[in-house]
């Protein structure tokens, strides 16, 4: 690689050192949010912070619910109650959702909390329910991308597919 393309480390940071970092996030009613752990993310490699979308991502939804419901989990990772308990899920995308066990002639119901609905449908009760979580994730991501409509932001009212193309321009 040319010299200008080489990364120069400034310092080393462990993933667990990022837990509790106060952040400002767009499109949230909270004045600050905090960096929280997810069991599906390795804290030993690739430390970093990513946006969580618990309305539409089953991994994110169930990680948030685990932290809200389980004081012992919060304690294990040093997560303070006021970092997690006040969080309300902000709906981002509306999708037509039909449970796999619904009668064929039943119309889908519109939801803006697809991750919660999918976790209920596939009986995901924690981040450890990996096979069910994969099913929930496959369904919500497909529905969101191909049939979802954005509820907020500059692309409000656009299909997710169109918004993705619009943002790339």
Predicted regions and their residues:
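Protease-associated
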Residues: 1-49, 59-62
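Residue patterns forming the tRNA-binding/recognition surfaces of aminoacyl-tRNA synthetases
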Residues: 30, 46-169
């Amino acid at each position: 690689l040319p010299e200008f393309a080489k990364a120069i480390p400034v310092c080393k940071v462990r993933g667990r050192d990022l837990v509790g970092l106060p952040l400002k996030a767009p499109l949230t009613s909270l004045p600050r949010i905090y960096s929280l752990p997810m069991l599906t993310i390795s804290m030993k490699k690739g430390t970093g912070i990513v946006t969580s979308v618990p309305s539409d991502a089953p991994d994110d939804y169930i990680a948030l619910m685990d932290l809200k419901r389980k004081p012992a989990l919060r304690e294990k990772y040093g997560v303070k109650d006021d970092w997690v308990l006040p969080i309300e899920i902000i709906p981002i995308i509306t999708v037509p959702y039909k449970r796999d066990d619904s009668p064929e002639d039943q119309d889908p119901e519109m939801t803006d909390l697809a991750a919660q609905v999918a976790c209920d449908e596939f009986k995901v009760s924690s981040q450890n329910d990996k096979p069910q979580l994969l099913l929930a994730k496959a369904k919500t991501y497909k529905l969101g991308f191909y049939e979802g409509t954005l509820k907020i932001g500059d692309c409000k009212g656009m299909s997710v597919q169109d918004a993705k193309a619009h943002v790339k321009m």
